[in-house]
UniProtKB/Swiss-Prot annotation:
UniProt domain comment: Consists of three domains: the N-terminal catalytic domain, the editing domain and the C-terminal anticodon-binding domain.
Protein name: Proline--tRNA ligase
Subcellular location: Cytoplasm
Gene it is expressed from: proS
Protein source organism: Acinetobacter baumannii (strain ATCC 17978 / DSM 105126 / CIP 53.77 / LMG 1025 / NCDC KC755 / 5377)
UniProt keyword annotation of Metal-binding present: no
């Protein structure tokens, strides 16, 4: 591509509404332009990157044996009513009617459509397993679109859906897709982690997310220093460490006027928050008569409750809800001053986090306003109904696989795979005939990659103060050739044209910057755009038989012979 025939839409200033670095650089590098809130036009520079991501994803999906389809963005609302998600999905689902007053939705995902396809086209177990995928536009009516294409309303996804006769067959395809995703993100040049994840609103049994590690990520990822273990913090198990020591202190109550938070209480008492417990009084599962019990959750003072873990306890109501003031009054409890003493005797279930369960001589609420208890010990002073993993892991915790300790970094979710089971096939009646001639409900998996989000995530991981530093596989151009003063020097232009043709013939994606611009402008644009290799051709270099080469990550340029240059580019 000749730069004189290409749209350079670079900006020198950062737009005020661009918060994260990827949004800033995508605008400045001329990759995207905002059309409306959460809607972006992809310019030629951005489209080139997008198509390269698209190509790698498509190659690996085809390699996995999946078959490409293409489904409508517009979907009949009746399918979503069948699945039960028409109301459940909430305001992110854009609903509208056509001129005939038929209700439709703009698809945020395609489980319903693909299941409808499968129930009409798949008739026998002999057709299973099968895996369909598409690369298609989605629309989610985000209440606050932000971060550019990272959280936009319209975006491109690769979504795949597999259909199986057995759970074992689903597991096999799930493992294939796990490996396929790992190959995709490796080829994209990203530092990523596959992590155990919650299944969320889509539902199902097993789930893994693929996260690109970046400081701007919205999710906390816990991973081992010595193994491949990685999990979303909401899913990472907090391992029990140590044993409870014997009591050494007497139990007593102390006045703590107006000291309600753990930090305030511990500072007032000159105590370590690690030697305190805090209570969270929540609603339990209602009994047959509709009575809702109170459940007391106790954690170490310096730890945070993991709501997802708490909701998985069979005695805790989901979604998690705090006990009402009326419920607290019925047991004579005061918010902010609740301790475990006497709760079991009052009929309250006391669930204690693992780390809190091994404390002795700790600080707790006194179950009286403006008082706390010190020297509290389990069994002697307070009873435990059950010990349960309730907290978020923290950096330095032992890895659950027994290898190393946990590090915690921010991650950007770019892929997600689920074992859906029969959630959608059951709801939409997707059945095939088995070996015995009887119909059975198929089991499903689904596998998504945010194609547009991958582009932004790659930038969040690869940039400096000059601009983007693309991994070569997805750079808009791999090589930029800059002939110095080409409009005045036919010799440099001729040499540049010859090298341009030679590198293109070798399969490189090359930009010949033949614009009538100052060298400084060209260099700034090329660094901003993140092109991995820059070759400058000048009169002095031609006289010496060398080319000036600079890799995008290099601090300094170097003069190379043509043979050295070609060897460098071939690596």
């Amino acid at each position: 591509m000749r730069a004189s025939r290409f749209l350079f839409a670079t900006l020198r200033e950062t737009p005020n509404d661009a918060e994260v670095i990827s949004h800033q650089l995508m605008l400045r590098a001329g990759m995207i332009r905002k059309l409306a809130s959460g809607l972006y036009t992809w310019l030629p520079m951005g489209t080139r990157v997008l198509k390269k991501v698209d190509a790698i994803v498509r190659e690996e999906m085809n390699r996995s044996g999946a078959m490409e389809v293409f489904m409508p963005v517009t979907q009949p609302a009746s399918l979503w009513e069948e699945s039960g998600r028409y109301e459940q999905y909430g305001p992110e689902l854009l609903r509208f009617k056509d001129r005939h007053d038929n209700p439709f939705v703009l698809g945020p995902t395609h489980e319903e459509v693909i299941t409808d396809l499968a129930r009409n086209e798949l008739k026998s177990y002999k057709q299973l397993p099968v895996n369909f995928y598409q690369i298609q536009t989605k629309f989610r009516d985000e209440i606050r679109p932000r971060f550019g294409v990272m959280r936009s309303r319209e975006f491109i996804m690769k979504d795949a859906y597999s259909f199986h006769a057995t759970q074992e067959s689903l597991q096999e395809t799930y493992d294939v897709m796990y490996d396929t995703y790992s190959r995709i993100f490796t080829r994209l040049g990203l530092d990523f982690r596959p992590v155990q994840a919650d299944t969320g609103s889509i539902g199902g049994s097993a789930s893994h997310e693929f996260h690109v590690l970046a400081a701007s990520g919205e999710d906390d990822i816990a991973f081992s220093t010595e193994s491949d273990y990685a999990a979303n913090v909401e899913m990472a198990e907090a391992v029990l460490v140590g044993e409870r020591a014997a009591p050494t202190q007497e139990f007593k109550l102390v006045e703590t006027p107006n000291q309600k938070t753990i930090a305030d209480v511990c500072q007032f008492l000159n105590a370590d928050p690690k030697q305190s417990v805090k209570a969270l009084l929540v609603q339990g599962v209602a009994d047959e008569k509709g009575n809702v019990p109170v459940v007391a959750l106790f954690l170490r003072g310096d730890h945070e409750l993991n709501e997802i873990k708490a909701e998985k306890h069979p005695l805790v109501a989901a979604p998690l809800a705090f006990a009402t003031e009326e419920q607290l009054q019925a047991f004579g409890l005061t918010a902010g001053f609740t301790g475990p003493q006497g709760l079991v005797e009052k009929g309250i279930t006391v669930i204690v986090d693992r780390a809190a369960s091994v404390l002795s001589d700790f600080v707790a609420g006194a179950n009286e306003a403006d008082k706390h208890a010190v020297g509290v010990n389990w069994e002697r002073d307070a009873q435990i109904t059950e010990v349960f993993d309730l907290r978020n892991v923290v950096e330095g915790d032992p890895s659950p696989d027994g290898k190393g300790t946990l590090q915690i970094k921010r991650g950007i979710e770019v892929g997600h795979i689920f074992q859906l089971g029969t959630k959608y096939s059951e709801a939409l009646g997707c059945k095939v005939l088995g070996e015995d001639g009887k119909p059975f409900t198929v089991t499903m998996g689904c596998y998504g990659i945010g194609v547009t989000r991958v582009v932004a995530a790659a930038i969040e991981q690869n940039y400096d103060d000059k601009g983007i530093i693309w991994p070569q596989a997805i750079a808009p151009f791999e090589i930029a050739i800059v002939p110095m003063n080409a409009h005045k020097s036919p010799r440099t232009l001729e040499a540049a044209e010859a090298l341009y043709a030679e590198l293109q013939a070798q399969g490189f994606d090359v930009l010949l910057d033949d614009r009538n611009e100052r060298p400084g402008v060209k260099f700034s644009d090329l660094e901003l755009m993140g092109i991995p290799h820059r070759i400058v051709i000048g009169e002095k270099g031609l006289d010496a038989g060398t080319f000036e080469y600079k890799g995008r990550r290099d601090a300094e340029a170097s003069n190379l012979t043509k043979e050295e240059l070609l060897a460098k580019l071939a690596r």
